[in-house]
UniProtKB/Swiss-Prot annotation:
The protein, known as: Glutamate--cysteine ligase
Molecular-function annotations in GO: ATP binding; glutamate-cysteine ligase activity; metal ion binding
GN (gene name): gshA
The keyword Nucleotide-binding is assigned to this record: yes
Pathway(s) of this molecule: Sulfur metabolism; glutathione biosynthesis; glutathione from L-cysteine and L-glutamate: step 1/2
Keywords tagged on the record: ATP-binding, Glutathione biosynthesis, Ligase, Nucleotide-binding
Reaction(s) catalysed (UniProt annotation): L-cysteine + L-glutamate + ATP = gamma-L-glutamyl-L-cysteine + ADP + phosphate + H(+)
Amino acid sequence: MIPDVSQALAWLEKHPQALKGIQRGLERETLRVNADGTLATTGHPEALGSALTHKWITTDFAEALLEFITPVDGDIEHMLTFMRDLHRYTARNMGDERMWPLSMPCYIAEGQDIELAQYGTSNTGRFKTLYREGLKNRYGALMQTISGVHYNFSLPMAFWQAKCGDISGADAKEKISAGYFRVIRNYYRFGWVIPYLFGASPAICSSFLQGKPTSLPFEKTECGMYYLPYATSLRLSDLGYTNKSQSNLGITFNDLYEYVAGLKQAIKTPSEEYAKIGIEKDGKRLQINSNVLQIENELYAPIRPKRVTRSGESPSDALLRGGIEYIEVRSLDINPFSPIGVDEQQVRFLDLFMVWCALADAPEMSSKELACTRVNWNRVILEGRKPGLTLGIGCETAQFPLPQVGKDLFRDLKRVAQTLDSINGGEAYQKVCDELVACFDNPDLTFSARILRSMIDTGIGGTGKAFAEAYRNLLREEPLEILREEDFVAEREASERRQQEMEAADTEPFAVWLEKHA
């Protein structure tokens, strides 16, 4: 079932320096909660400056949904320590509140209780809040409070030059973009390994169902928790953060121009369903527009091609200008066993898997096959640890046992690990392979199995509160390592100044400005 990458691995072993200079970044979302686990109703902590313009700490959907962002980094340890510093400083500056350590929220009875993220009075800031108003009215606020970790990854120019020859200009844009689309297609075909190993949302609080019927065969504990005994990541299921209305958009990942055209089409395509919401009611704007996507970021995807945008530039226009610069992996649940929601083992595994995805052959993928890959993902998401579980290839009928496919994949990853260790020194990547491959013979070692044992004992709420309290105490006590207190103070002041400058620079009323941007 795994493509034959022996030739590509032999090539890599002859060109190990092609992997020197991998760049990555991390983003981690977490809800601010009170000591009893309920959602914090306070505004964004003052010490964190402006959520609109802060370089490292912002908010996602809700005012209480923090998002931490590391700069691009070539050093894993440095990146994780930087992320930890962001958590340490925040933990000391959020009063008695804690950071919720799980992807799935609990103790939120009503979506109406959730305040949308606020970004001030600039047109850009108001636009961001209006976008969130649209998300709330389309999908419900509760779904938007699900948290995850995003891992951004780029291969060094040396890799592309070793693979494609001496490339530059338009040629480089085309070939590098084609290479990243290969990564994306392989990710859709084999990325289910991520929720298998690291999924950590096998259960949900009853409030999350909000009385809606579900066809999933949930088991229920006395404290009202619903769980599937072999589930890995309900966050990635239809109960979690997905968008069914997008499933027939026909966006494909074979070609840069085709992908961008599909994305731009979705932004222009009217939606009957969202038209029913209306655009305005009693003088209050309800969404940016009633198209299938209000803006490009609304496209739900487990992985995205990206390029850093210039001021006023849309993500797709940035891709057209310069091609794909990096990949954003979006399938990671919050790691409840780490105070910062992600750990070194996961980052090293993702490095290995992304390199493998860049090496393995990846035939073009029709929108039909893309839909078929969802079958494997859903199996792993809902019953990944079930004994005897099998997976298919694309839309074919042949089935293969998941543990065997996983072990075959890791046989390849081990060779990638040897190459990465040879240029970085030590055996850190090989050690990660040895630790994780054991999860295929013993699913009890996976994150989902480990966290479910705790949740069955103490419920999601009890588990979340215990971890949140422990991490709060730990992070508040730890000294900063990379950043200093004065760095945070300077960035707070600079971010507030940047927001004020944006507000002062606006010349048009929001309604006029919006007509040009909606």
